Amino acid sequence: VEWFTAPDYWLARLVFQRALAVVYLVAFLTAALQFRALLGERGLTPVPRFVERVPFRRAPSLFQWRYSDRLFAGCAWAGCAVSAALVAGLDSLLPLWGAMLLWLVPWALYLSIVNVGQTWYSFGWESLLLETGFVAVFLGNDEVAPPVVVLFLLRWLLFRVEFGAGLIKMRGDACWRKLTCLDHHHETQPMPGPLSWFFHHLPRPLHRVEVAANHVTQLVVPFLLFTPQPVATVAAALMIATQLWLVLSGNFSWLNWITVVLALSVVRYPVDPPSAAAAPLWYEVVVLAVAALLLFLSHRPVRNMVSRRQVMNRSFDSLHLVNTYGAFGSVSRVRHEVVVEGTADEAPREDGDWREYEFRGKPGDPRRWPRQFAPYHLRLDWMMWFAALSPAYAGPWFATFAERLLEDDRATLRLLRRSPFPPGAPPRFVRARLFRYRYTTWRELRETGACWERTYVREYLPPTRLTGAPDRS
């Protein structure tokens, strides 16, 4: 059927697939390097405990049948290997059905991880990667030209990502409507990057322009994705430019990058397509059936978008096939950070020798400049930001985190930048205190070299020791 394929988008498909495989690789690498302390058998929220109380139908996963740290590591590293093979173009060397099965592997593996990932995998970009990855299975390889309906599904997904984010802002915090949110956002965002301090200190009129441009990109430009070329390519380019601006302004895991990847599928490159065979009938039937299913399931996110009680980052099915998205419906005006400290003193005193644990990405030492980590995702650091917003976010895991520090747990300490205690000599007590952080001014930066100024607010976790721990004299 001639209308079924769009040969002019063969290069867009190639670029999209290779870029998506890179995002998959980062996601699996993040899982492989961090899971043991977070989700492992002795993790902060162990998978075995989770699967005991959550049935397969609510959280389908390979780990519902069996879990071990070795099996999880094997799945994560296998995901890395398959993703690397896809980056290298292995799918182009396989028959069409083989390429589709190969693309199904990272989706199934990552679904298994996300569905047991609990609070550590509760971010919108997890579902976004899964939804994008599922659609990508049906894009085909060099044997056939890209199917029109799959290209449409990718645009439909990109539309929901951008338009949903725009709507949640207009319905949420009043500062988005007043164009003032960026007076605070760069300072209070979850994980600032190396340029965030400078973004915060841009002139306020420029902040207004930033917010207005963001509204146009998220509320107007998405409709242009469904217009003829070259307008659709221009719309995609505007979205890519906006996302790259966000990449410079902070660490948002791979959220910005996978949005860029989706936009790349819209671009029509001025290159003649190679010859490709007609799509086999079985492929047409499968693609059309999947497209019909996804469009039917889309009624739920559409209903959510038009609702005045719109929610963001919600999955409507356990396979994460069609989801709703959004970001920063509300913006914090004040930044709080939980500072974790330990002491080797025999008794905890306020004026004792308390030493601070340093995190990789979370602000801590006021003189330490934020680093660039995205698209790599520091899950513990992100959840520490939520913990500072409310202890309720940290309820399931923070006490266990303190316990692991007292035990000198190697896996947990590897998530941190530095422990103030030498290996084998953990602290007797651990405590946590809440501080208010603000960016220094240009003058303060020149005089002190510090990018942050912090003020003590209150105790977060009182001095705690291991239950039944013997005195060490």
Q: Which residue ranges define each predicted feature?
A:
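Alpha-helical membrane-anchoring segments
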Residues: 1-473
